[in-house]
Design a protein with these regions (language model features):
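Loop/turn-to-beta-strand initiation segments
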Residues: 65-66, 123-127, 159-166
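N-terminal pre-Walker A segment at the start of P-loop NTPase domains
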Residues: 1-29
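Hydrophobic positions on the alpha1 helix immediately C-terminal to the Walker A/P-loop
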Residues: 51, 55
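Hydrophobic anchor at the beta1->P-loop junction of P-loop NTPases
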Residues: 40
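Conserved nucleotide-sensing/catalytic segment adjacent to the nucleotide-binding pocket
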Residues: 77-153
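Conserved P-loop NTPase motor module
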Residues: 7, 183, 198-284
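Conserved lysine of the Walker
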Residues: 48
Length: 284
């Protein structure tokens, strides 16, 4: 018989102070309750990133004291950059941070590790945004995933932290992260008919229990096919303008500005004959 079994018992005793603390937390509007890893997946142009931004804004509005940490350039906030320096990051965290109008920006894998290690906000919470998560930790490289990734993923609730990530295919994410994901959102965007829209403007998303999603070798979903819930929204111009929609996610060492798609690296000669629009199509 295992030596631990004699310690198994049935106890109805409870701590009154623990119950009081739980009640205080429930009544505290600043107490950050969202937690875990929430994944948004879909093909290019299906609206996974804008759906993530849609959710992040709702959470940030509800919890204005939460610190936002993002590898997406958020245009409606001031970026606090530390350029891979632990000392700079600690300097940022040592000062008072305006959580409503600023955010901590990271890009490289090293910077991602530092923000996971250092950024804590107590009961007010942390919102971590990671676009194209498979670029950091892919399922193709599962054996080389550092232990801290698993450690941090397993302790999001304790640290009052929610991690919003995107991936083109859910099964591209490293297995250790998929196992600790809570909800996986399948995203799909559509353009309005009759030439009223030049691109996707209406987005639908389906919420699945992430742990139940299974895929075959071709990436086709074979299990977990019944969504818990479905939602949708129209993409507003304000939502699109709140982040850099052309940004390229790069996780390695980078020269200043090279990998920011919003910064042109070429100069295009002006056309002698401007394009004209005929029946919704531009042509010369």
């Amino acid at each position: 018989m295992p030596n631990i079994l004699p310690f198994v018992s049935k106890s109805l005793s409870f701590d009154k102070e623990a119950i009081r603390e739980n009640r205080r937390n429930l009544k505290d509007p600043d107490y950050f309750r969202p937690s875990g890893i929430q994944t948004f997946f879909g093909e290019q142009g299906d609206g996974k990133t804008i759906t993530l931004i849609h959710f992040y804004k709702k959470i940030a509005k509800r919890y204005p004291k939460a610190i936002v940490v993002s590898n997406i350039i958020l245009k409606d906030r001031t970026a606090l950059k530390f350029d891979g320096s632990l000392d700079k990051l600690k300097s940022i965290l040592s000062r008072e941070i305006d959580t409503v109008s600023s955010y901590i920006y990271y890009s490289s894998l090293e910077e991602y590790a530092l923000v996971n290690q250092c950024v804590r906000n107590g009961k007010y919470g942390v919102i971590i945004i990671t676009d194209e998560y498979q670029n950091y930790f892919s399922n193709q490289d599962s054996r080389n995933v550092p232990p801290w990734v698993i450690h941090q993923a397993a302790q999001n609730r304790k640290q009052k932290r929610i991690h919003l990530v995107t991936s083109q295919d859910y099964d591209q994410l490293v297995k250790a992260v998929r196992r600790r994901s809570d909800i996986a959102f399948k995203c799909k965007s559509f353009a309005l008919p009759f030439g009223l829209s030049a691109g996707p403007i209406f987005t639908i998303y389906w919420a699945f229990i992430a742990k139940k999603l299974e895929f075959d070798n071709n990436g086709k979903r074979v299990d977990g096919s019944r969504p818990l819930k479905m939602g949708f929204f129209f993409q507003s111009q304000a939502l699109r303008d709140s982040y850099d929609t052309n940004q390229v996610v790069f996780t390695g060492s980078q020269a200043d500005g090279i990998y920011l798609a919003s910064q042109p690296t070429v100069t295009v000669k002006k056309l002698a004959v401007p394009l004209k629009r005929r029946k919704g199509v531009f042509s010369r």
